[in-house]
UniProtKB/Swiss-Prot annotation:
Gene: matK
Compartment(s) of residence: Plastid, Chloroplast
A GO CC term attached to the entry: chloroplast
Family recorded in the similarity comment: Belongs to the intron maturase 2 family. MatK subfamily.
Primary localization class, coarse: plastid
Species this protein is from: Zamia integrifolia (Coontie)
Protein name: Maturase K
Keyword terms: Chloroplast, mRNA processing, Plastid, RNA-binding, tRNA processing
């Protein structure tokens, strides 16, 4: 793969990103075959020992050539030689070609994205989910509104082709990609839609993920330069308004921003407090200003994406939340900004007086009620939080039962260790402790009291290791009880978070601001 990437870098720089010949490189499909057999567990038509011997690279070449000579046929492998498909179904060669169409543009896309981010400290990408929260902890308290954006998954195939045309000048490759996007609806296109393509499909194929990431990157690529130019723009000169002092003081904080993709100049208040974070299809833009200003930002962002990227993002998909009054959900947390009031005595030379000092604090909270609902859905408790035994696990050994409950609690506590309130987490621990004891009691046909006497301190103590407990206790002694610990080794959402997030995120969206 490294050799393929080196060849891709040299070829792209010399031939101006002509990628179609790479589809006929045999090394590419050797990688695709390894990926196919490592991923697929249901491939049974032939023995693994002879699988690589029966692969025909000539069939792949003919399939790619026929893709550009189709007459409306959905499957481009119908006319292939049936003898060369012995031991393989047509979906195997179809997946190989799709893998090639995915792997080839990944190389110039990675080079292009890396080159565009050089010297731009405002735009950083992290693997850890929790790396987002320290940024929000520092920046969001200085903002008073957020734009909660839900990026749609559906778009037209031609929009994706036009997106790739901005950085790929290879017409044959684009024709092949267009054919795949229009015809392979069973892999990356929703079955109940005729014209729209589902970018992030349920199968999460490599091609659908690449299409989603590249399209989202294109939509975000101009945000940082736009905001950077906006925040560093000079104020409007006001020498001609010398006699109108009040108007001068107001207009010096106004800038006029024009862009080559916009037909009109945009007037905004000059305020550099704009922060942007994204995880998958959720994007958060934190702003400081009035409600009218935030509505203007939503209007102009919607028009900008529609005119330039054909991203039909309806205004009701961009929620406006006021941080001082509302909380919003992001990555399984309920986030808000809390106002803290402290009494301060100010001493002057001749007198002293008492005043109130108001500070803003970022307040992430674990949604205990929603997590209990997820546990109820997984049959660990009922909807009110009363524990239920897991009868399906009674056939396992005692260590396996303990390890499974330990793993569930460890993941919950590890993920929500940054919560400002730990009471809900210990309630979750109590809910999981009783199902563990009840499951062991059902297995041994005894009472819960007997199980506790038998296992003693080993029951449900593996989930809170001594080293982690000592770290947490030492941190609590030296710091405030509301200080948070963000673990940088978390790279995906908690499974319980995914269950309630899907229900919360894909409900019917309101037509008005929250």
């Amino acid at each position: 793969m490294d050799k393929f990437q080196r060849d891709g870098k040299e070829y792209t720089s010399r031939q101006r990103r002509f990628l179609y010949p790479f589809l006929f490189k045999e090394d590419l499909y050797a990688i695709a075959i390894d990926h196919y057999f490592n991923r697929s567990s249901s491939f049974e038509p032939m023995e693994n020992s002879s699988s690589n011997d029966r692969f025909s690279f000539l069939t792949v070449k003919r399939s790619i050539s026929r893709m550009r000579q189709q007459n409306g046929s959905i499957v481009p492998f119908v006319n292939c030689n049936q003898k060369k498909l012995v031991g393989y179904n047509r979906s195997f060669y179809s997946e190989l070609v799709l893998g090639g169409l995915t792997a080839v543009p990944e190389v110039p896309f990675s080079i292009r994205s890396k080159h565009s981010l050089e010297g731009m400290n405002e735009w950083t990408s992290f693997r850890s989910i929790n790396s987002i929260f320290p940024l929000m902890e520092d920046k969001i308290p200085h903002s008073n509104f957020i734009l909660d954006i839900r990026i749609p998954h559906l778009t037209h195939p031609e929009i994706l082709v036009r997106t790739f045309r901005r950085w790929i000048q290879d017409a044959p490759f684009l024709h092949s990609l267009r054919f795949v996007l229009h015809e392979h609806r069973n892999l990356i296109i929703s079955s109940n839609l005729d014209q729209l393509i589902l970018i992030a499909s349920k199968e999460n194929t490599r091609l659908s993920l690449f299409l989603w990431n590249s399209y989202a990157y294109e939509c975000e690529s101009l945000l940082v330069p736009l905001w950077k130019r906006f925040s560093h723009s000079r104020s409007l000169p006001y020498e001609s308004f010398v006699e109108r002092t009040p108007f001068c003081r107001k207009i010096e904080h106004i800038i006029i921003f024009s862009h080559k993709y916009l037909k009109k100049s945009l007037w905004f208040l000059k305020d550099p407090s704009i922060h942007y974070v994204k995880y998958r299809e959720r994007s958060i833009i934190a702003l400081r200003g009035t409600y009218l200003l935030v509505k203007k930002w939503r209007y102009h962002l919607t028009n900008f994406w529609q005119c330039h990227f054909h991203l039909w993002l309806q205004p009701y998909r961009i929620y406006i939340d006021e941080l001082s009054n509302n909380c919003f959900s992001f990555l399984g947390y309920l986030l808000s900004v809390k106002m803290n009031t402290s009494v301060v005595r100010i001493k002057m030379l001749d007198d002293s007086f008492i005043t109130d000092l108001i500070t803003k604090e970022f307040d992430p909270i674990a949604p205990t009620t929603l997590l209990i609902g997820s546990l109820a859905k997984e049959k660990f408790c009922d909807i009110s939080g009363h524990p239920i035994s897991r009868l399906a696990w009674t056939g396992l050994t005692d260590d396996d039962i303990l390890d499974r409950f330990d793993r569930i609690w460890r993941n919950i506590f590890h993920y929500y260790s940054g919560s400002s309130k730990k009471d809900g987490l210990y309630r979750m621990k109590y809910i999981l402790r009783l199902p563990c004891a009840k499951t062991l009691a059902c297995k041994h046909k005894s009472a819960i009291r007997v199980v506790r006497e038998r296992f003693g301190s080993e029951l449900f103590t593996k989930s809170f290791p001594k080293e982690r407990e000592s770290i947490f206790l030492s941190f609590s002694k030296t710091r405030s009880q509301r200080e948070r610990i963000w673990h940088s080794d978390i790279i995906q959402r908690n499974p319980l978070v995914n269950s309630w997030w899907k229900k919360h995120n894909f409900q019917i969206e309101p037509l008005f601001d929250r």
